[in-house]
UniProtKB/Swiss-Prot annotation:
UniProt EC number: 2.7.1.130
GO BP: lipid A biosynthetic process; lipopolysaccharide core region biosynthetic process
Gene that specifies this protein: lpxK
One Pfam assignment: LpxK
NCBIfam families, per database record: lpxK
Record protein name field: Tetraacyldisaccharide 4'-kinase
EC class: transferase
GO CC list: plasma membrane
Biological source species: Neisseria meningitidis serogroup A / serotype 4A (strain DSM 15465 / Z2491)
SUPFAM superfamilies associated with the record: P-loop containing nucleoside triphosphate hydrolases
Protein family per UniProt: Belongs to the LpxK family.
Keywords tagged on the record: ATP-binding, Kinase, Lipid A biosynthesis, Lipid biosynthesis, Lipid metabolism, Nucleotide-binding, Transferase
Described purpose of this protein according to its UniProt entry: Transfers the gamma-phosphate of ATP to the 4'-position of a tetraacyldisaccharide 1-phosphate intermediate (termed DS-1-P) to form tetraacyldisaccharide 1,4'-bis-phosphate (lipid IVA).
Lineage: Bacteria, Pseudomonadati, Pseudomonadota, Betaproteobacteria, Neisseriales
Pathway given in the UniProt record: Glycolipid biosynthesis; lipid IV(A) biosynthesis; lipid IV(A) from (3R)-3-hydroxytetradecanoyl-[acyl-carrier-protein] and UDP-N-acetyl-alpha-D-glucosamine: step 6/6
Amino acid sequence: MPNCFKFHTVIERHWQKPYPVLSFLLKPLSGLFAKIAAKRRTDFLSGKRQSEKLPVPVVVVGNIHAGGTGKTPIVAALVSGLQEKGVKVGIISRGYGRKSKAVHVLNAESRAEDAGDEPLLLFRKTGAPTAVGSSRAEAGRALLAAHPDIGLIVADDGLQHYALRRDVEIAVFPAADTGRTDLDLLPNGNLREPLLRLDSVDAVVVSGGKADALFRPSENMFHSRIEAGRIYRLNNPSEILDTGRLKNQTVVAVAGIAKPARFFDSLRNMGITVKRTVALPDHADISAADLPDADAVIITEKDAVKFSDGICTDNVWVLPVCAIIEPDLAAFVLERLEDVPKAV
């Protein structure tokens, strides 16, 4: 396991700053991957492979990267924006990292092992009916059966899940990659599909910063930024942390997300002195036993949902975040669709 983790770390560094030797070895494999991915998409679009259309409009929010684009807060913001406009929204997702493969419609008792950490976070954050399943169409059918008043479904991820037809495609693209010329497909790079794929989506949302001036793959460009909320106690979310009291305390930050440095930087930007940081693999299981000793341990919202039954210690705090998308992405989606029913 340690050797596998070390190899994965080397590959991820290579994706950010390519090593010439690795590029020489991996480039042919990326060429093969590109051909397979292109044929698969063509087969679905031509009807050679079957795809399913759900009885309500489907909006896919995904990416051409292999994770780490800041998509989950954007999905939450879009769903909330649609809800504010009176739309009854449902969410479907694969539910990466969960222990079961069965379709699961989330409820108040759902845990991360049932649904996956990101779908559970979206469900709790937005209150939108949510279902998970490796087949998005099957998850969508189950969701509509449980909540027949849903007027629109947002598919979290699944841009490459062509077995489900979609009415609107939204691709999230990290600002840090908008000026790069060395991006490549897996395994030489971290792209699932080539940059040209962005030409065919309905909109591109640039996340995490300002895009390069020459980056404009779509007529419909949006930008998102993350705003940190008020830190609250895990065992009592109504209790807000007075960060001033941390001045003489030992603070440790723990994150099991794709880009933990963003989380750690957010805390420092809030004026919090973090003595130690603990970066866990994305979607990693985490329990109270994994948390280090400290006066205060601050974790992400995504990790917080893994403590479904709470924990015995009172020194664990949660930093919530939200995405601000400009211009109005929810309004754009409704303009692309016709006659989306509003909630009664």
